[in-house]
Regions:
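Alpha-helical membrane segments and immediately flanking helix-loop junctions
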Residues: 54-86, 112-130, 134, 151, ...
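Membrane-interface loop-to-helix entry segments
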Residues: 21-28, 32-45, 165-170, 181-229, ...
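Extracellular/periplasmic helix-exit of transmembrane alpha-helices
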Residues: 30, 108-117, 224-240, 254, ...
Length: 467
């Protein structure tokens, strides 16, 4: 009964509210920022490698890796597989649409996070939707509601789902026992996650900045190899992606399973553009201008969906193994790669899932640390944080043995609540970000390295960093 209720809420949110909100906001921001996805792509690449003035500060690259660690997760494999198996080839197109227009939303929200970030008692930068909701809208209760919804989404919903997706990958191996193996794998993952979490935020940044680039490069390399092997199928694959994306039945028929709805659901789950998660990481970066980190987070959306999600889609669709609802998730991906690469294929996917899930768990918990700092108006006690991290690790263990459809629906609903709070807020505050963008481009045009001062855009709010 509970599962039916949650599924109904999820279907309503993604068939009506979030379709209008996500696509509408993305188009609005794309127009107002004059197509930054193309116009400022070069600037985004340059901003990634910029060094912070303080040697001990978090660089743009490190902030990108933390946000990408959360974005690049099991959704890039299992989420894409599920979307295609349920919604068909056209789901891929709608994932691309959400990524391209959603990246403009990512630019706005991360710029706002930089402008309104605060300096903690420990000297670190803290920011995100909660901070700009309180500072600009003077509504701390709404900010706390957002924090609670995000903690529920990431520490519980997403982390349980990542744990389940990881253990399900092993179901293709002969040693897998449906009664015991999920709990054994969940226990091992929980122990490793707990060890890393108890090392604090600095260890999270260090681990993710090492794992994410290697993981992404290896995954794309394998995808390219598979596409070369199956190159004869690619024209047909692209043709079906486009034709099914605009098929009336695929868009409107049985909407819960339509290409559009599945593309939006899994695209949002994968790249997180506009839901308010990445700003918590982007605020920690030390940059000379807020727009630089906004551009970096725009690039992170491209990395996630246009590279990694597309890699999964092309690997599977070009294999000749037809997608089917009973194969959704790991089984279809493993079958597709086995067809192209033999026994190496399922083994590679298993390794990729382990790395993707692990970096997802760490990135998610980094966000929760930031949120707890906000709720407590400073660093919570060591005892509280230790207890929270132990509970977070236990959640990872529990998720491994839960029922998958319930986990997907819970995650979708919780993520939708975040979007329903954050997107209207960034629409209201977008003029501040747009003024910052104009200031950035004016300084670039004059030939200098853009340096932001709040008073230059008429911002009366007394910031901690941009006086």
């Amino acid at each position: 009964m509970l599962g039916i209720i949650i599924d109904s809420i999820s279907t309503f949110m993604y068939s009506k509210l979030l379709v209008i909100l996500l696509i509408g906001a993305g188009i609005y921001f794309t127009i107002r920022t004059k197509l930054p996805q193309m116009r400022l792509f070069k600037d985004a690449c340059k901003a990634v490698v910029e060094k912070p003035e303080d040697e001990n500060g978090v660089s743009s690259f490190q902030a990108l890796m933390v946000s990408t660690a959360s974005r690049v997760g099991t959704g890039n494999i299992i989420g894409v597989s599920s979307a295609i198996c349920i919604g068909g080839f056209g789901s891929v197109f709608w994932m691309w649409v959400i990524a391209i227009i959603g990246s403009a939303s990512a630019l706005i929200e991360s710029t706002l996070a930089q402008i309104y970030k605060k300096k903690g008692k420990d000297g670190e930068c803290y920011g995100g939707p909660a901070y700009y909701i309180e500072a600009a809208l003077h509504c701390r209760p709404l900010a706390i509601v957002f924090c609670i919804s995000m903690i529920a989404t990431y520490a519980f919903g997403f982390n349980m789902l990542a744990s389940y997706n990881l253990q399900s990958t092993f179901s293709e191996f002969s040693f897998y026992d449906t009664k015991w193996t999920p709990w054994i794998i969940g226990g091992i993952l929980a122990l490793i996650t707990g060890w890393c979490l108890l090392g604090g935020g600095s260890r999270i940044v260090k681990v993710t900045s090492t794992l994410v680039p290697a993981m992404g490069v290896a995954y794309i390399l394998i995808a390219v190899i598979v596409m070369i092997i199956n190159h004869a199928y690619l024209p047909v694959v692209f043709s079906k992606i486009i034709s099914e994306a605009f098929d009336f039945q695929a868009i409107f028929g049985a909407f819960a399973g339509s290409a559009m709805m599945q593309g939006i659901r899994r695209g949002l789950y994968s790249n997180e553009a506009g839901i308010g998660s990445a700003p918590n990481a982007s605020a920690s970066a030390q940059v000379s201008h807020p727009i630089k980190q906004g551009l970096v987070q725009m690039l992170s959306v491209f990395i996630d969906t246009l590279l990694l999600c597309t890699a999964t889609a092309m690997m599977c669709l070009s294999s000749g193994i037809a997608p089917a609802q009973e194969l959704q998730g790991a089984p279809w991906v493993q079958a597709a790669l086995h067809e192209s690469l033999g026994n190496f294929g399922p083994l590679f996917i298993t390794v990729a899932m382990v790395l993707f899930a692990f970096t997802t768990l760490l990135g998610n918990c980094f966000y929760c640390d930031n949120l707890l700092n906000y709720i407590h108006k400073g660093q919570p006690s060591k005892g509280f944080m230790k207890g929270f991290r132990i509970v977070s690790s236990l959640v990872v263990f529990i998720g491994a043995g839960m029922e998958v459809s319930m986990l997907w629906n819970i995650s979708d609903v919780l993520m939708g609540v975040m979007a329903l709070i954050n997107i209207p807020v960034i629409l209201i505050l977008s003029n501040t970000a747009l003024k910052a963008l104009a200031d950035y481009e004016k300084q670039k045009k004059n030939g200098g390295n853009p340096v932001f001062r709040a008073r230059d855009i008429g911002l009366e709010y007394e910031t901690d960093y941009w006086g």
